[in-house]
């Protein structure tokens, strides 16, 4: 069907079990939101966005949250458990039932299990690039990278495409594209240029003193914005001064956007995570990943079109720095036991919150990394531990992706892999 073909376009292989249901506007939203997943090109995206506007009365008020799991998570320890496979494939962790009939996931994701009826798991995605940059570039742009080892993609990835496409079409008080890092490894804006890179949120939003740094502005106005206390007390006057002096006409796009953001009450409120109710902050988890997920929700609710939040290092002890769980880097199960409960709380809260706040028709959540991990466990001596320990290596032949919201019919497992998780 139409959705099945979408997953196969431009070589990103996928198969679908179940059906693609829902009215045309929802289907159009899903196709737009799945640009990189399905390998859609920029013309594809523009035509589908136009079609989506027609079917929903001209609205473009849709957003995507991409939770990016840098390093490549193991599908076999998260969303595609193989308890019947030999232990050297299926591993030691066990599956649990969920609120979605027929969907089993890892025992270390019990909060996921409670909200599984609100997301889909796609188990049938694969590609051909087993290095981090190539895998990320392939997944995020929809194209085969020309230089797979280049840390920057040769083709524009989804966030910059959205930023370019929506330039001038949405409320200028919020940035179109926000990310927790300047760029994901293997991502980038490529030929679109630096104007469409994200508005970057650095730091840890869980820290008590967290705030978004000032933007870099042209010399003509920098002196008036260097002092944060002056900025907070004089934003209204700054806006009047800028408008009256026609200075806005003499500075470039970057600085116009900077002034719009710095003088926007909406932006300040959205970025100020300290204004969130403590109960909600606890629900997401008082750690780096949980508060990044919460901040992403605040931003799309305020009008940002595309948010990428990296969940690489959870900022806790017991695990490795990212999802790249080779045996030389760390112990497969020790890392899972440290990492997955943090991940579980953040993602389950985000999914639940999107629905509780009535955002599920306009916001799509995508949770993915650049590839899966080898189905067969590869024990090696750990660089730090100096002992033999289990791990899994890079594997683009099979991977799992979680998607939620976007007006989709949820609670589905889409596609499957072979008995040992080797391929779709």
Map each language-model feature to its residues:
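Ligand-binding pockets and gating/stacking loops
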Residues: 3-424
